[in-house]
Amino acid sequence: MSPAGEHGTAAPIEILPVAGLPEFRPGDDLGAAVAKAAPWLRDGDVVVVTSKAVSKCEGRLVPAPADPEERDRLRRKLVDEEAVRVLARKGRTLITENRHGLVQAAAGVDGSNVGRDELALLPLDPDASAAALRARLRELLGVEVAVLVTDTMGRAWRNGQTDAAVGAAGLAVLHGYSGAVDQHGNELLVTEVAIADEIAAAADLVKGKLTAMPVAVVRGLSVTDDGSTARQLLRPGTEDLFWLGTAEAIELGRRQAQLLRRSVRRFSAEPVPAELVREAVAEALTAPAPHHTRPVRFVWLQTPAVRTRLLDAMKDKWRADLAGDGRPAESIERRVARGQILYDAPEVVIPMLVPDGAHSYPDAARTDAEHTMFTVAVGAAVQALLVGLAVRGLGSCWIGSTIFAADLVRTELGLPADWEPLGAIAIGYAAEPAGPRGPADPGDLLIRK
């Protein structure tokens, strides 16, 4: 592609340290100090200053106790105050997002390059700080420079830290190549270069961490002021592929597993992978059961003719039962139409209560209690199956119709006489996917004694 479209330059660039700067304190004029130490600034230069220097001048220092444990306790309190959410924890390290949207360790609260009786916070508005320094240098030296405020950050998937821009003024922080064509004729579709971060990292080569050199100048780049700021470098958490740490993502998944289960009544035509159903059934079979038994069987209607024959027979019986109740024809057809979901769903599974291993009692009361216990166990397995399907992205709907036609179901499917159908489960990908529902308010449904 043409050099005019490049974000960098083929010409040499210079990275110049700004020596002779004082130890900054609250209220100091940062712009005046830089102008005095670097009267050689030119139009087009990029002035790169550490956020620590800005924080000191802006009074973002917090008195801290000298005792290491108390100092660390205060640091953690400040992290909680500065952070709007915690993305990840590992040992004593917290990765947080602050109110500006910056994601970094400890919300930018830092105890390096400050007195042992202080802790530093990030500038309240790093973009505004960059703009103010740019304006001050224009006022004092008559030059048009760009300004970056930087901080040190870790990087996903890679060891080590590098400086990145947290505040910017006077340059395009991003350069998009979408639609451009390289020298081999390949169209660049998604490439977008974070120019501000590249400059920040380069400038750190002369600033260092131990040299008391908080300001550097990058010279030789052709920068364009498009009005963008460092905020444009931030991707909102919900749009990021890695917006939670591993442990936090697993915890969220566990918390949402139950809430993902919803009654889905309209499915897409997308086929359901058989292995997903098998995996969900395998998990459902771990549900609690009495006497170490297996009180449930899942009958998977995989043969279309078998499913249709069963549903047609159930429909005829349902019509006859409703007619026997004296219902009008329109009411009967409305009720019968509710079962259409079992015709339309990509997959249907029928849970069966199987009394293998049930204890025998001479009296009806204990016999009924034993049956209830097995019924509860099958219900637990059904719920586990529905949740297992949901966490795999599959929708489902439990329908009780087979309970009302137990003999018919056993006959049509050739099942033993003591197997009891406990509904039917329609399975498929939801036509309109939905996220997890909110939990219910227990209210007076949770009774305390």
From Swiss-Prot:
Enzyme Commission numbers on file: 6.3.2.31, 6.3.2.34, 1.3.8.17
Which residues are noted in the entry as a divalent metal cation 2-binding? T152
> Record-annotated residues binding a divalent metal cation 1?
D110, D151
Q: In which pathway does it act?
A: Cofactor biosynthesis; coenzyme F420 biosynthesis
Required co-factor?
A: Mg(2+); Mn(2+); K(+)
* An example Gene Ontology molecular-function term: coenzyme F420-0:L-glutamate ligase activity
Cofactor remark: Binds 2 divalent metal cations per subunit. The ions could be magnesium and/or manganese.
| Superkingdom field | Bacteria
Which residues are involved in binding GTP? L21, P22, E23, F24, S51, K56, N113
Pfam families reported in the protein's UniProt record:
F420_ligase, Nitroreductase
Task: Output the GO biological process annotations, alphabetical, semicolon-separated.
Answer: F420-0 metabolic process
Q: Which UniProt keywords apply?
A: GTP-binding, Ligase, Magnesium, Manganese, Metal-binding, Multifunctional enzyme, Nucleotide-binding, Oxidoreductase, Potassium
The positions annotated for binding coenzyme F420-(gamma-Glu)n are D321
Q: Where is this region: Coenzyme F420:L-glutamate ligase?
A: 1-245
Which parts of this chain are annotated as the region Dehydro-coenzyme F420-0 reductase? 246-449
Q: Does the keyword Transport apply?
A: no
Reaction it catalyzes: oxidized coenzyme F420-0 + GTP + L-glutamate = oxidized coenzyme F420-1 + GDP + phosphate + H(+); oxidized coenzyme F420-1 + GTP + L-glutamate = oxidized coenzyme F420-2 + GDP + phosphate + H(+); oxidized coenzyme F420-(gamma-L-Glu)(n) + GTP + L-glutamate = oxidized coenzyme F420-(gamma-L-Glu)(n+1) + GDP + phosphate + H(+); oxidized coenzyme F420-0 + FMN + H(+) = dehydro coenzyme F420-0 + FMNH2
Look up keyword NAD and say if it applies. Answer: no
Q: Where does FMN bind?
A: R261, R262, S263, V264, R265, A289, G400, R437
Q: What HAMAP family has UniProt attached to this entry? A: F420_ligase_FbiB
What is this protein's function per UniProt? Answer: Bifunctional enzyme that catalyzes the GTP-dependent successive addition of multiple gamma-linked L-glutamates to the L-lactyl phosphodiester of 7,8-didemethyl-8-hydroxy-5-deazariboflavin (F420-0) to form polyglutamated F420 derivatives, and the FMNH2-dependent reduction of dehydro-F420-0 to form F420-0.
Which family would the database say this protein is a member of?
In the N-terminal section; belongs to the CofE family.
What is the name attached to this protein's record? Answer: Bifunctional F420 biosynthesis protein FbiB
